[in-house]
Amino acid sequence: MNQNGSQIHSDGNGHSDDTDTPGVSAGQVSVNTAGVDDLLDEIDGLLESNAEEFVRSYVQKGGQ
C-alpha cells in the first residue's frame, strides 16, 4: 500500500492498472470516422448528380 492506503497494481512492464491506454481509443475513433467519410462521399456523389432532387427530398422529410 502507498501512503494514502490505496493499492496500485502493475502488469510487470511498468504500467499500472489506473492509467488509460491512449492507443485503444484512437483506434476506435478511426473506425467511426471511416463510416462518416463513406456517408459524406455518398452525399457528395448524390449532390453532384442531382442536387435539386436531393434538396426536394430533404425538404419533404421535414428539413428546413
Swiss-Prot record:
What GO MF annotations does this protein's record show? proteasome binding; protein tag activity
This protein's record includes keyword Cytoplasm: no
The domain of life for this entry's organism is Bacteria
Q: In which pathway does it act?
A: Protein degradation; proteasomal Pup-dependent pathway
Isoglutamyl lysine isopeptide (Gln-Lys) (interchain with K-? in acceptor proteins): where is this cross-link? 64
Task: Specify where the region named Disordered lies, as residue ranges.
Answer: 1-32
Q: Which family does it belong to?
A: Belongs to the prokaryotic ubiquitin-like protein family.
Description of how the protein assembles with itself and partners: Strongly interacts with the proteasome-associated ATPase ARC through a hydrophobic interface; the interacting region of Pup lies in its C-terminal half. There is one Pup binding site per ARC hexamer ring.
Any idea what this protein is called? Prokaryotic ubiquitin-like protein Pup
Q: What gene codes for this chain?
A: pup
